[in-house]
From Swiss-Prot:
The gene is rps6e. One of its GO terms (molecular function) is structural constituent of ribosome. Keywords: Ribonucleoprotein, Ribosomal protein. Belongs to the eukaryotic ribosomal protein eS6 family. One of its GO terms (cellular component) is ribosome. It holds the Pfam family Ribosomal_S6e. InterPro entries: Ribosomal_eS6, Ribosomal_eS6_arc, Ribosomal_eS6_CS. HAMAP family: Ribosomal_eS6. It comes from the Archaea. This is Small ribosomal subunit protein eS6. The keyword Secreted does not apply. One of its GO terms (biological process) is translation. It comes from Halobacterium salinarum (strain ATCC 700922 / JCM 11081 / NRC-1).
Length: 131
């Protein structure tokens, strides 16, 4: 059974809510890709739609939108998720995970895409990233 640490970003308020999702709710994310819309009920936001924006595995390797599948792959990067160059033109071969969510993913980042009728703070609790 898959278990994810999910960080839900609310672009309207600028707050982030973080909690663990497992079981049937976690299975709603399996097989989806970065950019895919998922029913917000999977993260406790009934009536909302959330978009998968990224994630990482248990070793901290980031998911990349431009790498197909869910496997690990060594890619030559010039920047972006997984590598921040110090000089212009610097490139580096880095191991990253593909854009498809699998059981190997430990953390998922999602953003609220469509808001429902009830406020987010009421559904998820008022304690966001200000702890």
């Amino acid at each position: 059974m898959a278990t994810f640490q999910v960080a839900v970003a609310d672009p309207e308020s600028g707050r982030t809510y973080q909690f663990e999702v497992d079981g049937q709710d976690a299975n709603r994310f399996i097989g989806r890709e970065i950019g895919a819309a998922v029913d917000g009920g999977a993260v406790g936001l009934d009536g909302y739609t959330v978009e998968i924006t990224g994630g990482s595995d248990d070793a901290g390797r980031p998911m990349r939108e431009d790498v197909d599948g869910s496997d690990l792959m060594e890619v030559l990067l010039e920047g972006g998720a997984g590598f921040n160059p110090d000089e212009d033109g610097e490139r580096k071969r880095v191991t990253v995970r593909g854009k498809e969510v699998s059981e190997a993913v430990a953390q998922l980042n999602v953003a609220i895409d469509e808001h429902g009728e009830e406020p987010v703070a009421e559904l998820l609790g008022a304690d966001g990233d200000d702890e």
